[in-house]
């Protein structure tokens, strides 16, 4: 009787779907078998209205959350851990946007450069990275340009830089916050990189994508 009471009680509580991946992690900690709640994340992303307008440039959410915990930022506490939308879902929405006239897509995420499709399914094997996602989306014939934001310096991979070099649809534009030129400030901000790390990264990008 008591179990039924609590089941009925909790079933009436409002659900913050953006936090359910955290619930999943806690359930797995308590019980390795856990309960599969991934369908909630499907509903979260699928709740976006299908765009019918004819704008040339459109925004497309591919990732949410952040695991960096910079001291000045509330995103990890309000958006939760990083998780990525399935490639199939992104491609379907992108195709719809392009068919409705979009020629440019901007991929959005609190830390979009950390996109990895395996995060969504909590898999151990490698999934599709942001570079791979850009390559897949570039197969849409009518799509002319791809952009993305916002990035973190620690997640700009060689694979992504190479994709910029080889993919003509991926624009030579990088939104990469520097935050500070002082190592002591960067350390206090918990950015986990130095001024030199940032400069070396920019030099590497410029060398590969002049």
Regions found by a protein language model. Give the residues of each.
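Proteins enriched for Cys/Gly/acidic motifs involved in redox and nucleic-acid/cofactor modification
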Residues: 1-115, 129, 159, 170, ...
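Conserved SAM/AdoMet-binding glycine-rich loop
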Residues: 99-210
